[in-house]
Amino acid sequence: MSKNDHLSDDELSLFREAVQGSKKLRQDTIIHQPSKNFSEQQKQRKSLKEGKNEEFFFSDEFVPLLNEDGPVRYARDGVSKYEVKRLRRGVYVPDVFLDMHGMKQDEAKRELGSMIAYCLKENISCASVMHGIGKHILKQKVPLWLAQHPDVMAFHQAPLEFGGAGAILVLLSIPDR
């Protein structure tokens, strides 16, 4: 009922007659929390700070030494080659998929950082990054970016069921909390 709708005298008396004898209930089950009023400036600063944290590890100038023969693969020092083999065979099933088709490099870098941050927050150890084949720009850059991130234990070209040559399976280290 809007504010412009007015009750006639008959309707008002009928309502009073219907609720006569009822008691007002005291609300005691829900405690209202005061809302946090963030200014737009504070929200922008927070999102900018989070974005920088997610993008921090990826440099286009640093080129890690990766194996160039055969499918793309990488294992950090101390990670068993058996883990890479399990990635290759599809033993690890990715819980998160990032589709980079149509993204520019900066956008792809930002989304990759966001995906890794999300996986760490949600304790997800395996993810799939679908860079596509196209002009090979993202196909070349994604492994270089992944190798720079300290939480990436290993990655391997995905098996056909998860994207084949157009995707990479990433194994992340989940810190104990």
Curated annotation (Swiss-Prot):
SMART domains attached to this UniProt entry: SMR (SM00463)
Domain Smr: 98-173
HAMAP family from the UniProt entry: SmrB
Ranges annotated as biased composition (Polar residues): 30-41
Region feature (Disordered): 22-45
PROSITE patterns, per the entry: SMR (PS50828)
Family from the record: Belongs to the SmrB family.
The keyword Calcium is assigned to this record: no
Keywords assigned: Endonuclease, Hydrolase, Nuclease, RNA-binding, rRNA-binding
A GO molecular-function descriptor: rRNA binding
Keyword Nucleotidyltransferase among record annotations: no
Matches recorded under InterPro entries: Smr_dom (IPR002625), Smr_dom_sf (IPR036063), SmrB-like (IPR022990)
Species of provenance: Aliivibrio salmonicida (strain LFI1238)
GO BP, sorted A to Z: rescue of stalled ribosome
PANTHER family: DNA ENDONUCLEASE SMRA-RELATED (PTHR35562), UPF0115 PROTEIN YFCN (PTHR35562:SF1)
Function: Acts as a ribosome collision sensor. Detects stalled/collided disomes (pairs of ribosomes where the leading ribosome is stalled and a second ribosome has collided with it) and endonucleolytically cleaves mRNA at the 5' boundary of the stalled ribosome. Stalled/collided disomes form a new interface (primarily via the 30S subunits) that binds SmrB. Cleaved mRNA becomes available for tmRNA ligation, leading to ribosomal subunit dissociation and rescue of stalled ribosomes.
EC assignment: 3.1.-.-
Identification of the protein by name: Ribosome rescue factor SmrB
Subunit-structure text: Associates with collided ribosomes, but not with correctly translating polysomes.
